[in-house]
Protein backbone atom coordinates (compact mmCIF):
# COMPACT_ATOMS: atom_id res chain seq x y z
CA UNK A 1 0.00 0.00 0.00
CA UNK A 2 1.46 3.36 -1.01
CA UNK A 3 1.95 6.22 1.42
CA UNK A 4 -0.75 8.23 -0.36
CA UNK A 5 -3.30 5.44 0.14
CA UNK A 6 -2.34 5.09 3.80
CA UNK A 7 -2.77 8.83 4.43
CA UNK A 8 -6.10 8.81 2.60
CA UNK A 9 -7.33 5.87 4.68
CA UNK A 10 -6.25 7.51 7.96
CA UNK A 11 -7.92 10.80 7.00
CA UNK A 12 -11.19 9.05 6.10
CA UNK A 13 -11.11 7.06 9.37
CA UNK A 14 -10.52 10.19 11.45
CA UNK A 15 -13.27 12.10 9.62
CA UNK A 16 -15.76 9.27 10.13
CA UNK A 17 -14.91 8.87 13.82
CA UNK A 18 -15.23 12.61 14.48
CA UNK A 19 -18.51 12.87 12.58
CA UNK A 20 -19.92 9.87 14.46
CA UNK A 21 -18.93 11.33 17.82
CA UNK A 22 -20.42 14.72 16.96
CA UNK A 23 -23.82 13.20 16.20
CA UNK A 24 -23.96 11.56 19.62
CA UNK A 25 -23.63 14.51 21.97
CA UNK A 26 -26.79 16.36 23.07
CA UNK A 27 -25.70 19.98 23.21
CA UNK A 28 -23.10 22.01 21.38
CA UNK A 29 -22.49 24.76 23.95
CA UNK A 30 -22.15 25.47 27.68
CA UNK A 31 -22.23 28.80 29.49
CA UNK A 32 -21.61 29.48 33.15
CA UNK A 33 -19.43 30.93 35.88
CA UNK A 34 -16.76 29.94 38.33
CA UNK A 35 -15.52 31.03 41.74
CA UNK A 36 -12.38 30.11 43.60
CA UNK A 37 -8.88 31.11 44.66
CA UNK A 38 -6.11 32.85 42.71
CA UNK A 39 -2.50 32.66 43.85
CA UNK A 40 0.54 34.61 42.64
CA UNK A 41 3.58 32.43 41.92
CA UNK A 42 6.72 34.51 41.55
CA UNK A 43 9.73 36.05 43.23
CA UNK A 44 7.77 37.25 46.28
CA UNK A 45 5.83 34.13 47.16
CA UNK A 46 7.34 31.31 49.17
CA UNK A 47 4.56 28.73 48.71
CA UNK A 48 1.84 27.75 46.25
CA UNK A 49 -0.68 28.03 49.08
CA UNK A 50 0.43 31.49 50.22
CA UNK A 51 -1.42 34.74 49.51
CA UNK A 52 -4.49 33.11 47.96
CA UNK A 53 -7.16 35.61 46.94
CA UNK A 54 -10.77 35.24 45.85
CA UNK A 55 -11.41 35.22 42.11
CA UNK A 56 -14.27 34.70 39.69
CA UNK A 57 -14.76 33.84 36.04
CA UNK A 58 -17.28 33.52 33.22
CA UNK A 59 -17.08 30.49 30.93
CA UNK A 60 -18.24 29.65 27.41
CA UNK A 61 -17.53 26.14 26.14
CA UNK A 62 -17.94 24.66 22.64
CA UNK A 63 -18.49 20.89 22.73
CA UNK A 64 -17.15 18.89 19.77
CA UNK A 65 -17.86 15.39 21.09
CA UNK A 66 -17.99 13.53 24.44
CA UNK A 67 -14.18 13.67 24.63
CA UNK A 68 -13.22 17.11 23.34
CA UNK A 69 -14.15 20.75 23.66
CA UNK A 70 -12.80 24.31 23.60
CA UNK A 71 -13.32 26.68 26.52
CA UNK A 72 -13.24 30.48 26.41
CA UNK A 73 -12.97 32.11 29.83
CA UNK A 74 -12.47 35.51 31.42
CA UNK A 75 -11.19 35.66 35.01
CA UNK A 76 -10.89 38.46 37.56
CA UNK A 77 -8.82 38.32 40.74
CA UNK A 78 -6.02 39.78 42.85
CA UNK A 79 -2.28 39.04 42.99
CA UNK A 80 -0.53 39.75 46.29
CA UNK A 81 2.91 39.07 47.71
CA UNK A 82 5.72 40.39 49.88
CA UNK A 83 9.49 40.04 50.15
CA UNK A 84 8.90 39.12 53.81
CA UNK A 85 7.26 35.85 52.69
CA UNK A 86 10.38 34.41 51.05
CA UNK A 87 13.78 33.28 52.30
CA UNK A 88 15.54 34.52 49.18
CA UNK A 89 17.93 37.41 49.76
CA UNK A 90 17.03 40.50 47.74
CA UNK A 91 19.64 43.29 48.16
CA UNK A 92 17.23 46.08 47.26
CA UNK A 93 14.63 45.09 49.87
CA UNK A 94 16.71 44.28 52.96
CA UNK A 95 15.96 47.49 54.86
CA UNK A 96 12.71 48.32 53.08
CA UNK A 97 10.59 45.18 52.44
CA UNK A 98 8.51 45.17 49.27
CA UNK A 99 4.83 44.21 49.05
CA UNK A 100 2.14 44.55 46.41
CA UNK A 101 -1.56 43.97 45.76
CA UNK A 102 -2.45 44.08 42.07
CA UNK A 103 -5.63 43.52 40.08
CA UNK A 104 -5.63 40.67 37.56
CA UNK A 105 -7.77 40.24 34.45
CA UNK A 106 -7.19 37.09 32.40
CA UNK A 107 -8.76 35.94 29.12
CA UNK A 108 -7.96 32.51 27.72
CA UNK A 109 -8.88 29.90 25.13
CA UNK A 110 -8.08 26.30 26.04
CA UNK A 111 -8.51 22.88 24.47
CA UNK A 112 -10.02 20.30 26.84
CA UNK A 113 -9.73 16.52 26.67
CA UNK A 114 -11.90 14.23 28.81
CA UNK A 115 -10.36 10.89 29.79
CA UNK A 116 -13.79 9.24 29.65
CA UNK A 117 -16.72 10.05 27.32
CA UNK A 118 -18.74 12.71 29.14
CA UNK A 119 -22.55 12.73 29.16
CA UNK A 120 -25.71 11.34 30.70
CA UNK A 121 -25.35 7.95 29.01
CA UNK A 122 -28.53 8.45 26.98
CA UNK A 123 -26.98 10.61 24.27
CA UNK A 124 -23.76 8.60 23.82
CA UNK A 125 -23.52 4.90 24.67
CA UNK A 126 -20.93 4.40 27.38
CA UNK A 127 -20.83 8.08 28.38
CA UNK A 128 -20.22 8.78 32.06
CA UNK A 129 -21.49 11.56 34.29
CA UNK A 130 -18.06 11.90 35.92
CA UNK A 131 -14.71 12.32 34.19
CA UNK A 132 -11.26 13.76 34.84
CA UNK A 133 -9.87 16.06 32.14
CA UNK A 134 -6.79 18.05 31.15
CA UNK A 135 -6.51 21.31 29.26
CA UNK A 136 -4.04 23.75 27.75
CA UNK A 137 -4.08 26.79 25.51
CA UNK A 138 -3.22 30.46 25.19
CA UNK A 139 -4.27 33.49 27.19
CA UNK A 140 -3.83 37.22 27.74
CA UNK A 141 -2.96 38.78 31.10
CA UNK A 142 -3.62 42.35 32.23
CA UNK A 143 -2.32 43.41 35.65
CA UNK A 144 -2.68 46.85 37.18
CA UNK A 145 -1.62 48.30 40.53
CA UNK A 146 1.09 50.33 42.19
CA UNK A 147 1.16 52.75 39.27
CA UNK A 148 2.13 50.01 36.81
CA UNK A 149 0.15 48.37 34.02
CA UNK A 150 1.32 45.08 32.50
CA UNK A 151 -0.20 43.42 29.44
CA UNK A 152 1.31 40.11 28.36
CA UNK A 153 0.55 36.63 27.03
CA UNK A 154 0.31 33.48 29.12
CA UNK A 155 0.14 29.73 28.62
CA UNK A 156 -2.50 28.06 30.85
CA UNK A 157 -2.07 24.36 31.68
CA UNK A 158 -4.31 22.47 34.04
CA UNK A 159 -6.42 19.51 35.07
CA UNK A 160 -9.76 18.93 36.70
CA UNK A 161 -12.85 16.82 37.14
CA UNK A 162 -16.42 17.40 35.99
CA UNK A 163 -19.76 15.89 36.93
CA UNK A 164 -23.03 16.11 35.00
CA UNK A 165 -25.69 16.96 37.58
CA UNK A 166 -28.47 16.75 34.99
CA UNK A 167 -28.98 16.84 31.21
CA UNK A 168 -28.14 20.57 31.18
CA UNK A 169 -26.16 21.23 34.38
CA UNK A 170 -22.43 20.56 34.76
CA UNK A 171 -20.32 20.93 37.90
CA UNK A 172 -16.55 21.19 37.60
CA UNK A 173 -13.47 21.59 39.77
CA UNK A 174 -10.26 22.63 38.03
CA UNK A 175 -6.77 23.87 38.79
CA UNK A 176 -4.59 25.71 36.29
CA UNK A 177 -1.20 27.37 36.25
CA UNK A 178 -0.86 30.38 33.93
CA UNK A 179 2.76 30.80 32.79
CA UNK A 180 3.12 34.44 31.77
CA UNK A 181 5.79 35.96 29.53
CA UNK A 182 6.42 38.86 31.91
CA UNK A 183 8.51 39.23 35.07
CA UNK A 184 6.61 42.35 36.19
CA UNK A 185 3.26 41.00 37.38
CA UNK A 186 4.47 41.87 40.87
CA UNK A 187 5.74 45.28 39.76
CA UNK A 188 9.43 44.34 39.98
CA UNK A 189 11.60 43.02 37.18
CA UNK A 190 14.53 40.77 38.07
CA UNK A 191 14.89 41.44 41.84
CA UNK A 192 17.98 39.20 41.82
CA UNK A 193 19.81 41.84 39.72
CA UNK A 194 20.91 39.02 37.43
CA UNK A 195 20.21 39.16 33.70
CA UNK A 196 18.32 36.11 32.42
CA UNK A 197 17.25 34.91 28.98
CA UNK A 198 14.78 32.46 27.52
CA UNK A 199 11.04 32.54 26.85
CA UNK A 200 9.93 31.62 30.40
CA UNK A 201 13.21 32.32 32.22
CA UNK A 202 12.47 33.96 35.59
CA UNK A 203 8.97 35.04 34.57
CA UNK A 204 5.99 35.32 36.92
CA UNK A 205 2.99 33.02 36.89
CA UNK A 206 -0.23 32.53 38.81
CA UNK A 207 -2.53 29.63 39.59
CA UNK A 208 -6.29 29.38 39.91
CA UNK A 209 -8.41 26.78 41.71
CA UNK A 210 -12.04 27.12 40.66
CA UNK A 211 -15.42 25.52 41.13
CA UNK A 212 -17.55 26.02 38.01
CA UNK A 213 -21.21 25.56 37.15
CA UNK A 214 -22.30 25.60 33.51
CA UNK A 215 -25.59 25.29 31.62
CA UNK A 216 -25.80 23.32 28.36
CA UNK A 217 -27.69 24.76 25.39
CA UNK A 218 -27.94 24.67 21.59
CA UNK A 219 -29.24 21.15 21.01
CA UNK A 220 -27.52 19.32 18.17
CA UNK A 221 -30.71 17.46 17.24
CA UNK A 222 -33.43 20.10 17.63
CA UNK A 223 -36.27 17.70 16.80
CA UNK A 224 -35.11 15.55 19.74
CA UNK A 225 -35.32 18.41 22.24
CA UNK A 226 -38.29 20.52 21.20
CA UNK A 227 -39.84 19.97 24.60
CA UNK A 228 -36.73 21.33 26.31
CA UNK A 229 -35.82 24.25 24.01
Regions found by a protein language model. Give the residues of each.
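Outer-membrane beta-barrel translocator domains and adjoining extracellular loop/strand segments
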Residues: 44-48, 82-89, 122-126, 145-151, ...
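Predominantly the C-terminal beta-signal and adjacent terminal strand-loop region
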Residues: 104, 166-229
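Gram-negative (and chloroplast) outer-membrane scaffold detector with strong preference
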Residues: 66-147
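Short glycine/proline- and aromatic-enriched beta-strand/turn motifs that initiate or cap beta-hairpins
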Residues: 21-61, 210, 214-220
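Residues that define the transmembrane beta-barrel architecture of outer-membrane proteins
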Residues: 27, 50-54, 103-107, 128-130, ...
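Structural signature of outer-membrane beta-barrel domains
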Residues: 38-40, 77-81, 116, 139-143, ...
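Residues on the lipid-exposed face of transmembrane beta-strands in outer-membrane beta-barrel proteins
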Residues: 33-37, 58-62, 109-113, 136-140, ...
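Outer-membrane beta-barrel channels and translocator barrels
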Residues: 26, 63-67, 116-118, 164-166, ...
